[in-house]
Amino acid sequence: MGTALVQRGGCCLLCLSLLLLGCWAELGSGLEFPGAEGQWTRFPKWNACCESEMSFQLKTRSARGLVLYFDDEGFCDFLELILTRGGRLQLSFSIFCAEPATLLADTPVNDGAWHSVRIRRQFRNTTLYIDRAEAKWVEVKSKRRDMTVFSGLFVGGLPPELRAAALKLTLASVREREPFKGWIRDVRVNSSQALPVDGGEVKLDDEPPNSGGGSPCEAGEEGEGGVCLNGGVCSVVDDQAVCDCSRTGFRGKDCSQEDNNVEGLAHLMMGDQGKSKGKEEYIATFKGSEYFCYDLSQNPIQSSSDEITLSFKTLQRNGLMLHTGKSADYVNLALKNGAVSLVINLGSGAFEALVEPVNGKFNDNAWHDVKVTRNLRQHSGIGHAMVNKLHCSVTISVDGILTTTGYTQEDYTMLGSDDFFYVGGSPSTADLPGSPVSNNFMGCLKEVVYKNNDVRLELSRLAKQGDPKMKIHGVVAFKCENVATLDPITFETPESFISLPKWNAKKTGSISFDFRTTEPNGLILFSHGKPRHQKDAKHPQMIKVDFFAIEMLDGHLYLLLDMGSGTIKIKALQKKVNDGEWYHVDFQRDGRSGTISVNTLRTPYTAPGESEILDLDDELYLGGLPENKAGLVFPTEVWTALLNYGYVGCIRDLFIDGQSKDIRQMAEIQSTAGVKPSCSKETAKPCLSNPCKNNGMCRDGWNRYVCDCSGTGYLGRSCEREATVLSYDGSMFMKIQLPVVMHTEAEDVSLRFRSQRAYGILMATTSRDSADTLRLELDAGRVKLTVNLDCIRINCNSSKGPETLFAGYNLNDNEWHTVRVVRRGKSLKLTVDDQQAMTGQMAGDHTRLEFHNIETGIITERRYLSSVPSNFIGHLQSLTFNGMAYIDLCKNGDIDYCELNARFGFRNIIADPVTFKTKSSYVALATLQAYTSMHLFFQFKTTSLDGLILYNSGDGNDFIVVELVKGYLHYVFDLGNGANLIKGSSNKPLNDNQWHNVMISRDTSNLHTVKIDTKITTQITAGARNLDLKSDLYIGGVAKETYKSLPKLVHAKEGFQGCLASVDLNGRLPDLISDALFCNGQIERGCEGPSTTCQEDSCSNQGVCLQQWDGFSCDCSMTSFSGPLCNDPGTTYIFSKGGGQITYKWPPNDRPSTRADRLAIGFSTVQKEAVLVRVDSSSGLGDYLELHIHQGKIGVKFNVGTDDIAIEESNAIINDGKYHVVRFTRSGGNATLQVDSWPVIERYPAGNNDNERLAIARQRIPYRLGRVVDEWLLDKGRQLTIFNSQATIIIGGKEQGQPFQGQLSGLYYNGLKVLNMAAENDANIAIVGNVRLVGEVPSSMTTESTATAMQSEMSTSIMETTTTLATSTARRGKPPTKEPISQTTDDILVASAECPSDDEDIDPCEPSSGGLANPTRVGGREPYPGSAEVIRESSSTTGMVVGIVAAAALCILILLYAMYKYRNRDEGSYHVDESRNYISNSAQSNGAVVKEKQPSSAKSANKNKKNKDKEYYV
């Protein structure tokens, strides 16, 4: 016989009274599924994530049907068990959206017999057991091994609403399954009995148990009725059947005797809300401030068994319904968070019970019936005598179904009360003993009755009838009225808040409310008292206030309280409460003690000191604080107030001292922005739409997104507004002078900075009265955080001194960096950019930071500083201190306590510029302190190619030099192991009259770094690590006689002419004029630069304008003209009829080999055929270059080792008697030709790519093998690029049989002005034939002008680099310079500052990061700073190199002969580091080949340097 399940309240509720009373477990009852549409049963969620199992018994005759199902509510994971294929069980499941795994049992189970089914989950495996006969398993191929389960366990079918919502089902096909028809019983999860939660269209089928021992409440043998008659409710207490006849109108053990005297309570039966027969109901409405009070003082209660019954209807979650007793003898019945709470104490400790409904809460505005019974029972005690003891059995039931039974403690069994019976509330509910709530009831109470063996108190009736012992407080309506609900509100922004009236809680008080949020931080409640001043002989005057606060920090809830004797800070709950669920908070205090409870967990506290009075004089703020906080005093302990963390989330059911507060109405009255009268949690995550712009970091908040803009350079809710930039030049600052002194224990600081200096103050808090500071600064390229709390002044337990943290590295790179500081009491965290945070813990007990100012750029409050940090040069942006963006607040005028002279906007910073007017000007400063490490920074601007910028000598050989050489920066130093040189990397010479930034550093591991603008060069040196400097530091130059004694690697022969600025010497910013020990020459503040600058028409006839510091000069070399502005005629010769010839011969030891040539000449003639200029190589080599006229057109032929190459201007007829200028350039096999202003003719021979690769390869081929290799390449058809051993320049073409007749002017060839030399009777010039000089040598060719011209050539000509076979005449008397080869971190050999070269195969002189010439690159990609560039050769070039090696092997005998033949010639030696495959010899500008020594670390090699191998040139 089955009992149908009952529907109630719109939900399908199983009639689980029998189940919860033990029938499911003890009677062996099963669930009968009729196979009807809409049938379903839901069991509690089975967490089948990892390792778990569930089992049940099944009986059916059906071949198809859904047995069970659960999933993750529409995402990926599910498990389904169905009957299919002739009554066999089929199991399917999936994890992480993988292909579902399926297994089909072999044994049919639709035979009408009971079968045991067990499902075992083990990560990706699931096993199905049927009886003991079959076990099969299957594995899902999933990337994740854990299953996610959100839904309940559905058995027999799915609820209709779930079938209708396809998106909530992971497996859509489950909606189409037939419902199961049959019986299921004994559902277990992990061996524990599982009870159904709810269901529909399912019957509870009673079957006799398999074994004896029925329940005491079972029906009799005849099956008629039960133990309790007339509708009595049976419950089992101590294994005995107990009948509740109170609602039947009968009495007796089995409710069989009619009771004519006792009012029946049948109307309280489940589902029967009608009136009892002909009897009046006693109902009262309570609205939060009303209550009944029955005086028991005349007739005290003394009983061991009693009963309380009542009915209630409410929408509120919390409220006192009934209380009697005091101290340790009481009964308390209340509604707590929508559940019914019972607390009983008979003197030996409280018995607490909480009854919660299966679905929803009891505050559903429906009638619910409560019954509490207490009976004296014998209970077996375990002790020495094993005796039976008397205990009180307590049972509470709600709606006759939900029952909780327990025992009071020890031997106390009597309830005694001579106090009052409170109904619906009390004068101070929070102070009642054992009260779990602090507010009164709001709703309707009906038929409140207390009875025991001696007395029956119908409290509702007594109140209505006006019994003299019953007092009614407030206006009570004796009917059920709708009580206005306390609607929840939502604080949508951190700035929103509500002001509540002052809370008068001097001695006692209580506050309760519910909240829910997902945000980690927020001030929920705050109020403080009148400020009072405390004075002490040892302490300065301090302001103290009483205060009360409840706040959230990092997801935890804290209570803060100070009554004048010290602050307490209590964490109300160990778990975080920002999970989006509702939490009920109840705060109660009585004097110095009290409790704070969250949901059911209560935390007691006792305030320190003697004060018991909480004197709050200000309003009580809910959700946050007003923007204008001038009248508020923030205790340092309330971190959220000082951090400006307002609460964002929902609040409801606020009760203060038991009185409800309609906060929705208050918000409307106050017109509070950002407060919404409802509470809902949006399912969509706001950050999914990427609302944060400009790479802001998004965090999901409560129905909102929160953007972290600190690392973006933008501000605003969505990082949409560009933050203001402040520029600092070392003399600038911004100072925030706060209106009142601040005291904080927690700070959030963030800022962005950009600087090229390794030192400088970023931000600091300063105090006028103490050494307290929180300071951020750059220190050796790192961010340094200093927190100093002045313990001496306030006589606290002194700490070990300032706490410091360091983060970041090489932050002086002129890039934006973000710094974040978080301090919470003693805890420190420092983060730079996205690097790992550095954390620290402060020592001592003192955590309060005092400050009057927030300063940037310069610290002005210096009274308590032992050392003043260096001033800042750079840019600051987005400075935010505790939520205040001060830079933008200052700019916008939002605050009036801001003082600054830093400049708004991003500006190029040139700090304290100084001009060195002449090359003999310099200053001397105090010795540079760079013993263990060094950070130098300066800016310079010049037009000079060379000059000494910085020099400091020291003990022994120690020194440091920074200089310009040919427009490139050199850093030279000696730490004691020999001099080293690092050449700075730059794309072009730096003497371009533009500002350049230079950073030079050395760390403790001897890593040297040179950074010029954005290009970086690094080198590690071995050996000594200390730079021991002693003498003065010279800036701009030294005394004239000192240049001769400078170290050999120093090229400077004169000082620096130009501007220096932003000089930073290891964090010291010297004033180059004021701080100078002495000055020499003309030095002025500021930097005006040249008074005359290059213009488009500064130089005539296509002359090149060269900017000089005191003006400009013109490079006329390729114009054929002369003079300061290239508008004077060049040296001119007339070649008359019969012809003539001017011949220049290089000395035998000075014959250059060139990769690039430049030739220019002016002429006029009427000849159709003639040779103007011819350059020939040494006899037997066959290389030449010839400029000629053919059929009236100009052309050039040249040969550099293989075929003749010709280039001609075919469009211009030049034998017209007019003056023409021809310009020719060659680079390898490529050539250009231009006549006058005609377009440039270009010629690129085929196979040029191979030529470039050959040029790379030839750099690694010794000169002695060059000719052999060239011959081998000639056979292979390769085009060479070197014009070898140039011997003569022949002008006039007489020897070639095509003599020139006409005028030739201003001949220029690779730096030689041959016609000028002829006019000056140069010894290497021979003139024959009819040749006549026109006029005089141009006046511009003075010695000074020539030097200027040659300087111009060096600075602009990159294709006329030459190499001679021996030292030039000008340097012949001086030993060759010896320069070290130093290893950098990237295996770059740092050699000469000039062009590194092979002695034949020469590259144009271009700077590289290590001092080596970079091979020509294809494309525009720059090498990574500080690294050597790698050139990958093609397979054809690889084969070529193999051939080169083979050819070299065949030439050994030839080399031996060559060494003997040329042993008396001047030598140019070089050293190759075989392990690095880099060539390290360097060419001087005058053509000298420099001898070099081994690396300085190889001391033995230095000692034997005279025994090095020598190579000779063929």
UniProtKB/Swiss-Prot annotation:
Residues 219-256, 683-720, 1090-1127 form the EGF-like domain. Residues 1-30 form the signal peptide. The chain crosses the membrane at residues 1439-1459. GO terms for cellular component: cell projection; cell surface; endoplasmic reticulum; GABA-ergic synapse; glutamatergic synapse; neuronal cell body; nuclear membrane; plasma membrane. It is a single-pass type I membrane protein. Disruption phenotype: No visible phenotype, but mice display subtle behavorial deficits. Females show deficits in nest building and taking care of pups. Mice lacking the alpha-type isoforms of NRXN1, NRXN2 and NRXN3 are born at the expected Mendelian rate, but die during the first day after birth, probably due to neurological defects in the brainstem that impair normal breathing. These mice express normal levels of the beta-type isoforms of NRXN1, NRXN2 and NRXN3. Mice show reduced density of synapses in the brainstem, especially a reduction in the numbers of GABA-releasing synapses. One of its GO terms (molecular function) is calcium ion binding. Ca(2+) 3 binds at D1183, V1200, I1282, N1284. The keyword Transmembrane helix applies. Residues 197-221, 1396-1427, 1481-1514 are annotated as: Disordered. Residues 31-1438 are extracellular. It is found in: Presynaptic cell membrane. CDD domains: EGF_CA, LamG. Residues 31-217, 283-480, 487-679, 725-898, 912-1087, 1133-1331 form the Laminin G-like domain. Residues 1481-1507 are annotated as: Interaction with CASK. O-glycosylated; contains heparan sulfate. Heparan sulfate attachment is required for synapse development by mediating interactions with neuroligins and LRRTM2. Keywords: Calcium, Cell adhesion, Cell membrane, Cell projection, Disulfide bond, EGF-like domain, Glycoprotein, Heparan sulfate, Membrane, Metal-binding, Proteoglycan, Repeat, Signal, Synapse, Transmembrane, Transmembrane helix. The keyword Acetylation does not apply. Belongs to the neurexin family. This is Neurexin-1. It comes from Mus musculus (Mouse). The lineage of its organism: Eukaryota, Metazoa, Chordata, Craniata, Vertebrata.
